[in-house]
């Protein structure tokens, strides 16, 4: 069976998703510049404006150690954003080479993040402090 959830805003365009260990779904809302949270058990949805604003175009996203990490692809340079799930606070860092639209991110087995910098012919490793 396929179950679909309609997001709260008709202009939402989720590009990528990340799933936490407790099966909560987070999505990068590319068109509106938001991070969204969907609880598939209850259908509850909550959204936060991305730090880079409505034109930040969140794209690649992953979960690591109690936080959602994603990239804002329309900022120059692209930024890496971290959203702490307990405090609901954001942190951001500029991507040194610019990012070039990070469309995909993954968590490594040793607790770091790998990003595909698709317009720059680069792959980046983000070493996450413990």
Task: List each language-model region with its residue ranges.
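Short loop/turn segments that connect beta-strands within beta-propeller blades
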Residues: 1, 39-43, 84-88, 127-130
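Beta-propeller fold detector
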Residues: 3-7, 46-50, 91-95
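Beta-rich, blade/repeat-based domains predominating
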Residues: 9-24, 53-66, 71, 98-110
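A generic "binding-loop/recognition-motif" signal
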Residues: 10, 31, 41, 54, ...
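Residue-level signal for WD-repeat beta-propeller blades
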Residues: 19, 29, 39, 62-63, ...
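Conserved beta-strand positions in repeat-built beta-propeller and related beta-rich domains
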Residues: 25-31, 68-75, 115-119
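A short loop-to-beta-strand structural motif that recurs across blades of beta-propeller domains
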Residues: 34-37, 78-81, 122-125
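Blade-level signature of beta-propeller repeat domains, shared across WD40, Kelch, NHL, RCC1
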Residues: 99-130
């Amino acid at each position: 069976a396929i179950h679909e959830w309609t997001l709260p805003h008709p202009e939402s365009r989720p590009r990528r998703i990340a799933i936490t260990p407790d099966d909560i779904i987070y999505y990068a809302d590319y068109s509106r510049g938001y991070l969204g949270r969907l609880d598939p058990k209850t259908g509850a949805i909550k959204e936060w404006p991305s730090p880079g604003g409505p034109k930040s175009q969140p794209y690649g996203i992953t979960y690591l150690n109690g936080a959602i990490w994603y990239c804002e692809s329309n900022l120059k340079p692209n930024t890496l954003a971290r959203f702490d799930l307990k405090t609901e606070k954001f942190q951001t860092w500029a991507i040194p080479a610019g990012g070039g639209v990070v469309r995909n991110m993954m968590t490594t087995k040793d607790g770091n993040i790998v990003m595909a910098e698709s317009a720059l012919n680069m792959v980046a490793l983000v070493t996450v402090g413990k």
